[in-house]
UniProtKB/Swiss-Prot annotation:
Catalyzes the methyl esterification of L-isoaspartyl residues in peptides and proteins that result from spontaneous decomposition of normal L-aspartyl and L-asparaginyl residues. It plays a role in the repair and/or degradation of damaged proteins. It is an enzyme of class 2 (transferase). GO terms for biological process: methylation; protein modification process; protein repair. The gene is pcm. It is found in: Cytoplasm. GO terms for cellular component: cytoplasm. NCBIfam families: pimt, PRK00312.1. It comes from Salmonella typhimurium (strain LT2 / SGSC1412 / ATCC 700720). It catalyses: [protein]-L-isoaspartate + S-adenosyl-L-methionine = [protein]-L-isoaspartate alpha-methyl ester + S-adenosyl-L-homocysteine. This is Protein-L-isoaspartate O-methyltransferase.
């Protein structure tokens, strides 16, 4: 049974143009309050971004739904997430595909996200502490790559790890950021600009 708060959020997302019912069902199935600090629990089902510490945020549900929808996932899709963060986006993906790979540069966030995912019995996720700019070459190629922080330009390593027909969805830019969708077609990459966005920067390197 979906609660009133969850139903209200889903209706708001539909009004904002989210059409993929599988994505909406995944959002309804993942308890967002489990991925944020207790002080913000009362805001868990509001359509806003919230701080999770270490200068990072949990994205607003609309942006999670929009980016996930753009990936055009099937259960068999091989998915890479750059920026595990709280693990919320990871959990949404884990409800939609058989397996998710996720890279986080901040060790403390990676550890907390793994704990939350296990508590929710989401065991179809592999997480790695590392530099998101480099992707996860050992697990490539991927059908879908999602980046939850903004690099100033599209990382070439991530484009190289896309399989034929694969889709990369990410925010790009410094002061002015735009959500981009990159699709690999043979030796070419077709890049579409979706909408203006605001994300924390994708920082190179990793933190213990």
């Amino acid at each position: 049974m979906v609660s009133g708060r969850v139903q209200a959020l889903l209706e708001q997302l539909r009004a904002q143009g989210i059409r993929d019912e599988q994505v909406l069902n995944a959002l309804a199935a993942v308890p967002r309050e489990k991925f944020i600090d207790e002080a913000f629990e009362h805001k868990a089902w509001e359509n806003i971004a919230l701080p999770i510490g270490q200068g990072q945020t949990i994205s607003q549900p609309y942006m999670v739904a929009r980016m996930t929808e753009l990936l055009e996932l099937t259960p068999q899709s091989r998915v890479l997430e750059i920026g595990t963060g709280s693990g919320y986006q990871t959990a949404i993906l884990a409800h939609l595909v058989h397996h998710v790979c996720s890279v986080e540069r901040i060790k403390g966030l990676q550890w907390q996200a793994r704990r939350r995912l296990k508590q929710l019995d989401l065991h179809n996720v592999s997480t790695r502490h590392g530099d998101g700019w480099q992707g996860w070459q050992a697990r490539a190629p991927f059908d879908a790559i999602i980046v939850t922080a903004a690099p100033p330009e599209i990382p070439t390593a991530l484009m190289a790890q896309l399989d034929e027909g694969g889709i990369l969805v990410l925010p790009v830019g410094d002061e002015q950021q735009f959500l981009k969708r990159v699709r690999r077609r043979g030796g070419e990459f077709i890049i579409d600009t979706v909408e203006a966005v605001r994300f924390v920067p994708l920082v190179k390197g990793e933190l213990a």
